[in-house]
Amino acid sequence: MNPNQKIITIGVVNTTLSTIALLIGVGNLVFNTVIHEKIGNHQTVIHPTITTPAVPNCSDTIITYNNTVINNITTTIITEAERLFKPPLPLCPFRGFFPFHKDNAIRLGENKDVIVTREPYVSCDNDNCWSFALAQGALLGTKHSNGTIKDRTPYRSLIRFPIGTAPVLGNYKEICIAWSSSSCFDGKEWMHVCMTGNDNDASAQIIYAGRMTDSIKSWRKDILRTQESECQCIGGTCVVAVTDGPAANSADHRVYWIREGRIVKYENVPKTKIQHLEECSCYVDIDVYCICRDNWKGSNRPWMRINNETILETGYVCSKFHSDTPRPADPSTVSCDSPSNINGGPGVKGFGFKAGNDVWLGRTVSTSGRSGFEIIKVTDGWINSPNHAKSVTQTLVSNNDWSGYSGSFIVKTKGCFQPCFYVELIRGRPNKNDDVSWTSNSIVTFCGLDNEPGSGNWPDGSNIGFMPK
C-alpha cells in the first residue's frame, strides 16, 4: 500500500470511529431522558453526563456520573373547626318534660365521701352538660359539715362536675370562691360570675376562659347576689341579672352585658312594674327571657325580656295560678304589671317558659313550704285573660318529699334550644325530722320534648337514719 492509500485508510477509520462515538453519546442522552421521566417521587436518579471528544479526535469517550435526589414534600395542615358564638335561636317545640339525670348525691354520701353543697344548677357547652353548685368546703357528716345551713361563708366555692354524678373528691373542679354565682358558655369559652366577701362590702369576680377579667363591687352594701343558675349569651354577649339591697324591701336590680369577660354596660331594672327581683332563671327564645323571684311582695313571678343591647320589657307573669312559695291557693289574682301582694315573702327560686300566650311554670306542690314539685301549663297564662286554665300538670316529686330551688337551662340542638330544668332536693337542716347537723342536696333534671310524657316520682330518696350525723 502506497503512502497515499495509507493516509486515506486512516482517515476513513477515524471518521467511522468518530461517527460511532457520536451515535453512542446521542443514544445515552435519549435513554437517560426516558428513564428520568419514569422515576417516581423520593427516588435517587443517576444521570450520566457525556463528554464527547471532537470528531477528528476519536481516542476516548468520557462518562461522568452525578447523583441527583428528587424530593416532593407535601404538607398537610389540620386545623380545629372554628368555634362560633351562640346564635339567637328559638325554643324547640315541646309538649311535656321527661327525666334526664339524677345524681343521688345524698344516698351516695352515706360513706361521707360526698361534698356538702346547695344552690345547684346545670349549664351546657358545645359537648357536655355540667352540674354546678356552691360547695361548703366540707364532706357530708364530717365535723366541718356542722352548721352548713349558713348561706354565706368564706369557705364556699363554685364547683363543677359531670351532670348525673355526685360531687365527690376527684370528680369536681373548683371554679372560684363564691357564695352566689352564675355561669354560661358563649359558644367559645365559659364565663362565671362569682360573689363573695362581707355582706356589706362584697364583690363579684368575672372569670372568662379560666382567667379573672373584670369585677363588680357592691353598691348598696347589702348582699350583692346573682342568679344561682345559668346566665345566657347571644352572639358573644352574655346577660346577667344582679341584685343588691334588702331581701324584703326595696332593693336595686341591674342587668349586666358582658363580652369575653369584660363588662360592656349595665342598666337598672325599671321599678315602674317590678318591685323586687332576684335569683332569675333565664333562657333564650330569640331574646333572653328571665323568670325571677319577688322576695318582698309577689307570689306571682316577675319577668324580663332582654336583647344584646337593652331591657325590652318587664312585668309579672299574669297567670292566676301563681308559682312562688308561699302562695295562695289556686286560683288567685291576675296581676300582669305588679306584684300580687298576697303571700309575697319570702319566696323560692323558680322558673318558667313562655309558649306563645301560654306559660309553663315550675312550682312546689306545697303552697307554704319547699316540698313536692310539679310543672303546670297555663293556657293564656302569659296574657291578661279571663280564660286562664291549667291544661297540663306533671307532678314530678310528691308532696311527701322535699324539694327546694329550681331553675331553667337550655341545650342547643339543630336550629333551636331545648328547654330543660333542674329541681334541688334539699335534705338535712332545717327539717326537724332530719336529725343531722348538715344541710345539703341532690338534684334531678328534666328536658322538654314534642311528645306526650309518662308519669313518675323522683325524690331524693335517702334514709336520713342511715346518714352520718
UniProtKB/Swiss-Prot annotation:
In what way is its activity controlled? Inhibited by the neuraminidase inhibitors zanamivir (Relenza) and oseltamivir (Tamiflu). These drugs interfere with the release of progeny virus from infected cells and are effective against all influenza strains. Resistance to neuraminidase inhibitors is quite rare.
Q: Which family does it belong to?
A: Belongs to the glycosyl hydrolase 34 family.
Single GO biological process annotation from the record: viral budding from plasma membrane
Region annotated Involved in apical transport and lipid raft association, chain positions: 11-33
Q: Name one GO molecular function term.
A: metal ion binding
Name the glycosylated positions: 57, 66, 72, 146, 308
Entry comment, domain topic: Intact N-terminus is essential for virion morphogenesis. Possesses two apical sorting signals, one in the ectodomain, which is likely to be a glycan, and the other in the transmembrane domain. The transmembrane domain also plays a role in lipid raft association.
Q: List the disulfide bonds.
A: 92-416, 124-129, 184-231, 233-238, 280-292, 282-290, 318-336, 420-447
Q: Assign the protein's first listed, main location to one coarse class.
A: virion
What the protein does comes down to:
Catalyzes the removal of terminal sialic acid residues from viral and cellular glycoconjugates. Cleaves off the terminal sialic acids on the glycosylated HA during virus budding to facilitate virus release. Additionally helps virus spread through the circulation by further removing sialic acids from the cell surface. These cleavages prevent self-aggregation and ensure the efficient spread of the progeny virus from cell to cell. Otherwise, infection would be limited to one round of replication.
Q: What else is known?
A: The influenza A genome consist of 8 RNA segments. Genetic variation of hemagglutinin and/or neuraminidase genes results in the emergence of new influenza strains. The mechanism of variation can be the result of point mutations or the result of genetic reassortment between segments of two different strains.
Q: Name it.
A: Neuraminidase
Q: Which domain of life is it from?
A: Viruses
InterPro entries noted in UniProt: Glyco_hydro_34 (IPR001860), Sialidase_sf (IPR036278)
GO cellular component terms, semicolon-separated: host cell plasma membrane; membrane; virion membrane
- Keyword check for Disulfide bond: yes
- Binding residue positions for Ca(2+): 294, 298, 324
Residues of the region (Hypervariable stalk region) are 36-88
